[in-house]
Amino acid sequence: SDAEKVYDIEGYPVFLGSEYYIVSAIIGAGGGGVRPGRTRGSMCPMSIIQEQSDLQMGLPVRFSSPEESQGKIYTDTELEIEFVEKPDCAESSKWVIVKDSGEARVAIGGSEDHPQGELVRGFFKIEKLGSLAYKLVFCPKSSSGSCSDIGINYEGRRSLVLKSSDDSPFRVVFVKPRSGSETES
């Protein structure tokens, strides 16, 4: 399958290094954007959760790639994702996959932030889902690992988790912050 450019909701290409909100492609009942949130009694917002309301955009992320420093993002670009702003209590705002108690969840931080869990090495990709939406997938570095869709665990706080192939993925679109609201680094 040929790699295609990834587009934002206004039809512009999505670029490495720019800021975007990742929000549900399903208007209304689908919920809103994503942000770090507290789960499992942790004091620090380490898990990545989806806002309940579609009026809430969550917090913007920035995509980077170990392969190149700038340019357009394609459906085969290996990505790192990080929130533009980091909670003070976390080591990093970079997205990671943490395996603990049988679940692989999407979180932020480094290994010090997740003493109970195991961080899975790998990278994220954006894949097309229908004509206008996308899904995020995670591809482990281990040769045996094939990529898994990122979905939502609706029990509790709508946390983002790796899904097995038969579950439905989190359908997303990318929204550029309105100019003026974007924080210049």
Curated annotation (Swiss-Prot):
The keyword Nucleus does not apply. InterPro entries: Kunitz_inhibitor_STI-like_sf, Prot_inh_Kunz-lg. Disulfide bonds join 44-89, 139-147. Its main location: secreted. The keyword Glycoprotein does not apply. It is found in: Secreted. Keywords: Disulfide bond, Protease inhibitor, Secreted, Serine protease inhibitor. Gene3D superfamilies: 2.80.10.50. GO terms for molecular function: serine-type endopeptidase inhibitor activity. GO terms for cellular component: extracellular region. Transmembrane segments: none annotated. The record marks 68-69 as: Reactive bond. PANTHER family: KUNITZ FAMILY TRYPSIN AND PROTEASE INHIBITOR PROTEIN (PTHR33107:SF21), KUNITZ TRYPSIN INHIBITOR 2 (PTHR33107). Inhibits bovine trypsin and human plasma kallikrein. Belongs to the protease inhibitor I3 (leguminous Kunitz-type inhibitor) family. This is Kunitz-type serine protease inhibitor DrTI.
